[in-house]
Amino acid sequence: MDSFCLHHYQFSSRLILGTGRYSSPSLAQQSIEASGCEIVTVAVRRFHALHAFTPLINWNRYWLLPNTAGCRTCSEAVRVALLARQLLQHLQQPHQCLIKLEVIPDPLYLLPDPLGTLKAAEILVRKGFAVLPYIYPDPVLALQLEQIGCAAVMPLASPIGSGQGIQHVHSLQLILQNARIPVIIDAGLALPSDASRVMEMGASAVLINSAIALSPSPVSMAHAMKLAVQAGRLAFLAGRMPLSSSAHASSASFGSFL
């Protein structure tokens, strides 16, 4: 499968994993391994919990993508992003500019704040960050974030952790058709078929957490997601057959029987 380029870095896997909601660090580690992912995202507020993963995960094999989950305002997200850069330096991670930006003032539905996200992204881009903003699937906002220099956009498929699957097909299609930066579908994907479908639509990658962590068999689900992402990407590259309003026989209607 072709590689995935994010801020000049190349990745062979188009599946990104979150690390929350697992019943144990060991199960998280096994799921990460089974997924074949290369990027793992961790909330900066949970960096203190990394010590539980340290004996289990070889961080030289994975890119640690910090996120600003839990931030309700622009200023709070900027402060947490700056802290994330310091933490990555302390952990001697080679990439210290990538940040997944989340500004979520709504505690019930966890929908991102478009104005706060745009403002925080502008500040962080000026400070040298490669910003990956988590957004509602708004094509206009996605374009604005691209224009200010974001490294990618991360529109949601449906609310975080809801397992509702793909609820915004048309809006996601508009973003995918017009974006010139990677589009990573984040939040709400519940099944491998969801992951495959957004990859078939042209997504650059997907970020999955709850669908794996809350599965009765997280390791098996992680492997299933890996295969689904690969299948969806191959299908996108191959191209679907043309639509037709009438039926067309796949076998010849004439000739002799053997």
Curated annotation (Swiss-Prot):
EC number of this enzyme: 2.8.1.10
Signal peptide: none
Subunit structure: Homotetramer. Forms heterodimers with either ThiH or ThiS.
Record: residues binding 1-deoxy-D-xylulose 5-phosphate: 161, 187-188, 209-210
Gene Ontology BP terms: thiamine diphosphate biosynthetic process
Gene: thiG
EC top class named in words: transferase
Primary role: Catalyzes the rearrangement of 1-deoxy-D-xylulose 5-phosphate (DXP) to produce the thiazole phosphate moiety of thiamine. Sulfur is provided by the thiocarboxylate moiety of the carrier protein ThiS. In vitro, sulfur can be provided by H(2)S.
Record-annotated active site: 100 (schiff-base intermediate with dxp)
Family indicated by similarity: Belongs to the ThiG family.
Name of the featured protein: Thiazole synthase
Species name: Cyanidioschyzon merolae (strain NIES-3377 / 10D)
One term of GO molecular function: thiazole synthase activity
Catalytic activity from the UniProt record: [ThiS sulfur-carrier protein]-C-terminal-Gly-aminoethanethioate + 2-iminoacetate + 1-deoxy-D-xylulose 5-phosphate = [ThiS sulfur-carrier protein]-C-terminal Gly-Gly + 2-[(2R,5Z)-2-carboxy-4-methylthiazol-5(2H)-ylidene]ethyl phosphate + 2 H2O + H(+)
Annotated localization: Plastid, Chloroplast
Cited Pfam families: ThiG
SUPFAM superfamilies attached to this UniProt entry: ThiG-like
InterPro entries linked: Aldolase_TIM, Thiazole_synthase_ThiG, ThiG
Pathway: Cofactor biosynthesis; thiamine diphosphate biosynthesis
GO cellular component: chloroplast
